[in-house]
């Protein structure tokens, strides 16, 4: 349905405040609720799921090396808001319809605090999944300051829970970054971009089977395919409406000065290629998922964002007084070779530049931003070859896999040792770009190249392809493009245990494009001993106390929180 653009102001999710402390650690309680929320001037209120009853959820603002405790509480209804496919692994008929678990995306945390897909829980913790450990999560924040986010990660229904509204920002800060004097306060704004579709009554539309289109789709709707489950998962979801921070095509009034925007692609499957409608306005890139770059990159005219990717940018509106400027999108769907965006989907939000400043702009964007260690491929102890493939399930539906294996097939095939550096090669034999996300670690992208032949039998590798500016820093999600091998390098640690790695197209993730890796104990590595060349704000030594204490702290908090 067509809604008028730029009639609603951009909302700002509120910053969470701790409930108090437990053993001196700030303690938060966040409750998932079903509420009605107004998403556009001309739409009736929409039923959404929100953390603390807000879509998107409230923002955590935390400090490096200052841990917090969070009790995630499920007070959602017993029946799901969206169509649940009971043939999908993890969502079988014997499982409760509504299950939740929260993943702190890019959090350097132990496995029991990671939000494992099978650590789900139901309302009031009445039922829990096989990997559930405790009610209170311990986040040590022993990592670089960065733009993290939190979202649902429940096996088999992640796509539905996130679509319903379960996502929010988690901003990690420190004094060194604040001393840079980047734009801050009301001039630092997180933006989460998502696509959705609506029924005329304001409710979310999500397809019940492949081929079902949102209103105003042709009437009558297509017949139910009797050869498929009903409801059935779809290969990917692409909405016909863009929301930013939970508002449909919003506007933001800005002053003629520098702003800092932390931009997250929070969509299920849609990619964005963002730029500005004014050709002389561009981005200064200062950070990616894993925090600030070593040096700023100026004059960036466009940025590609896959689902889960983030960028940290400065935009200077000083020379655009009185102008209305559109943040635009040129990405095809599916990416990269699908349909170009419609006129509606080529617009994201509007910036209305005022004539005057409220106060002088004293913020700066220094040339040098942070210490950034470059991992040396020569230090890698293993090069792992991973192949992305297309398959079909028992109903003939498209099913993408990692190494032709499903989520729970044993043995676990990726088994790095704690503290070691590995190179992972991602060979994509499918026609789509897949955003591949590894839990626990951040990594760097070494190279991309085309390949031909069998990836498992001496493929022919072409020359390296240029990386985008937004791929030069620490990452937690890499775009594995079709017909290419993407090479990433990571130091695994500091926690040991089992973590997921997966495609962050949520329909793919829910339909088996997810595997586990196990970070194994390494008797030759002590995370409390500094590694030469590692930047202080990224050192594993920040976490060494937490490695011993986090589980016991969380268990103690579970006991006290149930008093």
Locations of regions flagged by a protein language model:
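Divalent metal-coordination and catalytic microenvironments
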Residues: 30, 70, 102, 152, ...
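C-terminal substrate/ligand-recognition segments
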Residues: 372-445, 450, 476-505
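Ser/Thr/Pro-rich low-complexity tandem-repeat tracts
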Residues: 552-554, 560-562
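Active/binding-pocket-proximal capping segment
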Residues: 278-292, 429-470, 496, 506-509, ...
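Extracellular/periplasmic metallocenter environments
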Residues: 75-81, 89-178, 296-354, 430-434, ...
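Histidine- and aromatic-rich segments of cupredoxin/plastocyanin-like copper-binding domains
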Residues: 106-126, 197, 208-368
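N-terminal, post-signal-peptide metal-ligating segments of extracellular/periplasmic oxidoreductases
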Residues: 1-128, 134-136, 219-261, 266, ...
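Peripheral, solvent-exposed domain-edge segments
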Residues: 189-190, 194-196, 200-201, 207, ...
């Amino acid at each position: 349905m067509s809604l008028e653009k730029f009639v609603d102001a951009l909302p700002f999710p509120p910053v969470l405040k701790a409930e108090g402390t437990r053993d001196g650690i700030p303690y938060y309680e966040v409750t998932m609720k079903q509420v009605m929320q107004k998403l556009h001037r001309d739409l009736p209120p929409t039923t959404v799921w929100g953390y603390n009853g807000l879509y998107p959820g409230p923002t955590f603002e935390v400090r490096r090396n200052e841990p917090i405790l969070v009790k995630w509480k499920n007070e959602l209804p017993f029946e799901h808001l969206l169509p649940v496919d009971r043939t999908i692994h993890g969502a079988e008929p014997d499982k409760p319809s509504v299950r939740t678990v929260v993943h702190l995306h890019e959090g350097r945390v132990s496995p029991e605090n990671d939000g494992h897909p099978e650590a789900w829980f139901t309302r009031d913790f009445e039922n829990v999944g096989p990997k559930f450990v405790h009610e209170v999560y311990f986040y040590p924040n022993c990592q670089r300051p960065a733009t993290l986010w939190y979202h649902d990660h429940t096996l088999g229904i992640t796509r539905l829970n996130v679509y319903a509204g379960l996502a929010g920002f988690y901003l990690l800060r420190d004094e060194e970054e604040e001393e840079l004097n980047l734009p801050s306060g009301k001039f630092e704004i997180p933006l989460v971009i998502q696509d959705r579709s609506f029924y005329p009554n304001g409710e979310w539309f999500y397809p019940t089977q492949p081929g079902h289109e949102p209103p105003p789709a042709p009437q009558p709707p297509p017949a139910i395919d009797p050869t498929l489950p009903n409801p059935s998962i779809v290969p990917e979801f692409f909405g016909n409406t863009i929301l930013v921070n939970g508002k449909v095509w919003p506007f933001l009034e800005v002053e003629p000065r520098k702003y800092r925007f932390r931009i997250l692609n929070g969509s299920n499957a849609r990619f964005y290629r963002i730029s500005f409608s004014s050709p002389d306005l561009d981005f200064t890139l200062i950070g990616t998922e894993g925090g600030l770059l070593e040096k700023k990159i100026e004059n960036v005219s466009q940025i590609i964002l896959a689902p889960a990717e983030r960028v940290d940018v400065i935009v200077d509106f000083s020379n655009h007084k009185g102008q209305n400027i559109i943040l635009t999108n040129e990405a095809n769907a599916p990416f990269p070779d699908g349909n170009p965006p419609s006129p509606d989907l080529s617009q994201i939000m509007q910036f209305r530049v005022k004539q005057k400043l409220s106060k002088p702009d004293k913020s700066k964007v220094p040339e040098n931003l942070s210490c950034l260690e470059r991992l040396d491929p020569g230090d890698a102890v293993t090069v792992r070859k991973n192949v992305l493939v297309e398959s079909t399930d028992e109903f003939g539906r498209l099913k993408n896999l990692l190494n032709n294996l499903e989520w729970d097939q044993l043995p676990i095939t990726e088994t790095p040792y704690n503290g070691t550096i590995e190179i992972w090669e991602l060979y994509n034999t499918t026609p789509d770009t897949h955003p591949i996300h590894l839990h626990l670690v951040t990594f760097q992208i070494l190279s991309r190249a085309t390949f031909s032949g069998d990836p498992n039998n001496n493929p022919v590798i072409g020359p390296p392809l240029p990386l985008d500016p937004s791929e030069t820093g620490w990452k937690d999600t890499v775009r594995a493009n079709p017909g290419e091998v993407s090479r990433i390098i990571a130091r695994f640690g500091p926690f040991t245990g089992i973590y997921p790695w997966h495609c962050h197209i949520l329909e793919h993730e829910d339909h088996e494009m997810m595997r586990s890796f196990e970070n194994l104990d390494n008797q030759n590595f002590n995370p409390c001993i500094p590694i030469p060349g590692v930047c202080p704000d990224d050192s594993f030594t920040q976490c060494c106390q937490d490695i011993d204490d986090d589980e016991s702290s969380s268990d103690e908090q579970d006991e006290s929180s149930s008093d």
